[in-house]
């Protein structure tokens, strides 16, 4: 299900629908605030939360990959703990890409497990304990910002600069899980991801933020594939599939068809056969995202190309300083 357009109007000019739903949004915000009062588990190692205020995709997975790699470069064994959205296993269980499928552990943990130890746990505190017992020197808590079950030592809120915080209202009147002021009041850093023009608009729309802001962009990982003039049928089931389609066009690919699927939508045999037939009729190559690729049926894994992206931060200084304060530095 795609988010409604009225979620992303200017905050100063809310739509009629947003105004009508505002009481429900206030009730949602109040429920979140009550939930956040609960006591959390204090881990024995630093816990870094990568979260967002918006419902849906903002770039948390590329951020988690970047932080895993940065901590690894510092000699820190960081483990990811995720709820495993879309998977059926309750955990805690360490994700094994050779054994697990997305239907069991979720697509994001399965992708993240290629970059470092990843755990799935419905009970995040239990997942943190399991990771600690397995030797984690730091925990990356994936999408747990509104979950109070684990105490966070560093919270990084990620936002897509192209859409910002939408109309600034809470679900269902807008895209927010909690009000901007309250959410950023608990955060340590804000990371806005997007190209220069999107960053400029975000800064203009949200000029007075109570938290230091980092900026970055998603850059295509060069894998030797020449996308120039490549005829493709692209499909994506992520938070904002149009970002993926735009990245392909920026690489020079010719999108003969772009199919936006629901976020985390299962990629069953019937759907993939339909897309394959359409691609053959168009003389096009099937292309998807890394996150979607882990949900592909085995029979299609050699038939579909991916366009990997990685987060490039403009300046790591603030994050490196935060890691230093937490004692996350190479020793010996």
From Swiss-Prot:
Binding residues for ATP: 54-61
Record's GO cellular component terms: plasma membrane
Pfam families: LpxK
InterPro entries linked: LpxK, P-loop_NTPase
UniProt catalytic activity: a lipid A disaccharide + ATP = a lipid IVA + ADP + H(+)
Record keywords, A-Z: ATP-binding, Kinase, Lipid A biosynthesis, Lipid biosynthesis, Lipid metabolism, Nucleotide-binding, Transferase
Keyword ATP-binding: yes
Keyword Coiled coil in annotation: no
Enzyme class: transferase
Protein encoded by which gene: lpxK
Organism of provenance: Cereibacter sphaeroides (strain ATCC 17025 / ATH 2.4.3)
UniProt pathway: Glycolipid biosynthesis; lipid IV(A) biosynthesis; lipid IV(A) from (3R)-3-hydroxytetradecanoyl-[acyl-carrier-protein] and UDP-N-acetyl-alpha-D-glucosamine: step 6/6
EC numbers for this chain: 2.7.1.130
Membership in a protein family: Belongs to the LpxK family.
GO biological process: lipid A biosynthetic process; lipopolysaccharide core region biosynthetic process
Regions that span the bilayer: none
Function of the molecule: Transfers the gamma-phosphate of ATP to the 4'-position of a tetraacyldisaccharide 1-phosphate intermediate (termed DS-1-P) to form tetraacyldisaccharide 1,4'-bis-phosphate (lipid IVA).
Listed name of the protein: Tetraacyldisaccharide 4'-kinase
GO MF terms held by the record: ATP binding; tetraacyldisaccharide 4'-kinase activity
